[in-house]
Amino acid sequence: MPLPLTVVPIPGPGAEDVLVTPDGRVWTGTADGAIHVHDPVTGETTTVTATGGRPLGLENLPDGRILVCDAHRGLLALDPATATLETLLTEVDGERLLFCNNAAVTSDGTIWFSDSSRVWRVEEWKSDLIEHTRTGRLFRRTPDGQVTTVLDQLCFANGVALTSEADAVLVAETGTRTIRRVHLNADGTAGASTVWVDDLPGHPDNIALGSDGLVWVTVASPTDKALTLLQKSPRAVRGMVRRLPERLKPSPKETARVMAFDSVGRLVHDLDFDATRWHLATGVREHGGRVWLGSLVQPAIAYGDVPGR
């Protein structure tokens, strides 16, 4: 039986990611560019600012600000006290970021972040999966502003997270249902890359390290056999399907599922929440035994409790 899920309306469409800040408040960004904060104690939700783009992944920065991965505008830093925004990065090697998606931040302020596609923007995310462009990338930005490409040719690079020991960075490949692991060297640079978890039962989106030390993974949709078959088809066929009417393209199923893994990739939790009022989980944060969820399509965030916590 699906687990109960509490829905929290947000004044904006597509609350894609969620972030719990040290004060316990829950932040999210919506498709209209707005950044909102919800107070679980009072139940109040406030719109703080707008980026002028499409905010996706959110992350705590060591200086108390909030990192915003804006699909249109790149990496931004939000001061929650003043609601001011600073642009940290818009391009890499002279090429503007087309689909800045998600990030993880180490204690020294180094930002590891994903760019999902060099071909399609967030509004055409489905086109990238159908065409199987494999143009996703993982980057590393040091506090002095230097940026290096860590991985490329990823199949829709998506969620990024640190392991509990901070000895590796993980990045989800939505198109291949895989999570890759990049070892961190003693000096904080990227080492070898390996597959951490593969053959997931669905397409992963955002991932995050929880307060329980586990890596939480959203399963945005169960494995789509049509999409899997299509990705093996000739390029011309993929292009033809991309141009079909939206109703004829492969689409996510209406589920609300998250999984949690330990530091070596062993499954610890597989939670299937009630999706009758809320679905398509794309963002996740575990905090004190509660799982907060964001959705690319819902004008709401949601939460449920981890059984046994």
Positions of PLM-derived features:
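Sequence-structural signature of mature extracellular/luminal beta-sheet repeat domains
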Residues: 1-309
